[in-house]
């Protein structure tokens, strides 16, 4: 059994005749996002996919087997919801609600496509979208932060979430640092001019005595709060 363990980068262009002659592997989206898979080429040959973890294959991708042979990926037709709307606002609302649910979505110029789900179909109809169940290849958008050649929520969500947290931390950390420094500066300014705050430690003034003859009209009970 041959092992397929390499994916040719999309920017590397192969001779069209080589790609055309390569045996094909037709997979639905759920199998295309598995990095470990026992599969059968359309020719009937059984192969083992051992791709880098997180790889999600797309229609037209070219794989390399351990013997140097090429294999071309075909996205199989599958049951999906094909979503359209009478206006851009309704379609945008549909995309927003699907995104809130971390649903893998294929985005077209005037349509959305997602895996068949009767609950989501009902939700989309309620906001005014037109929803049809069809059999078509499904190629959802890649993760917002993951980038690269990875696609699909299950394989990229953890990475996307971690990167999103990192981005948030960098921005939030900067703002917190700024606020913290500003707060200390402001507090120090008030401390240098205030006469009514207290300090919880005694000041040794040597022979200077605070009594009726001191001449001071205020008291220093200093306690930092």
From Swiss-Prot:
Keywords: Chaperone, Cytoplasm, Nickel, Nickel insertion. Residues 171-225 are annotated as: Disordered. InterPro entries: UreE, UreE_C_dom, UreE_N, UreE_N_sf. It is found in: Cytoplasm. One of its GO terms (biological process) is urea metabolic process. GO terms for molecular function: nickel cation binding; unfolded protein binding. The keyword Aminoacyl-tRNA synthetase does not apply. Pfam families: UreE_C (PF05194), UreE_N (PF02814). Residues 171-215 have a biased composition (Basic and acidic residues). Residues 216-225 have a biased composition (Basic residues). NCBIfam families: PRK13261.1-1, PRK13263.1. Involved in urease metallocenter assembly. Binds nickel. Probably functions as a nickel donor during metallocenter assembly. Belongs to the UreE family. This is Urease accessory protein UreE. It comes from Paraburkholderia xenovorans (strain LB400). The lineage of its organism: Bacteria, Pseudomonadati, Pseudomonadota, Betaproteobacteria, Burkholderiales. The gene is ureE.
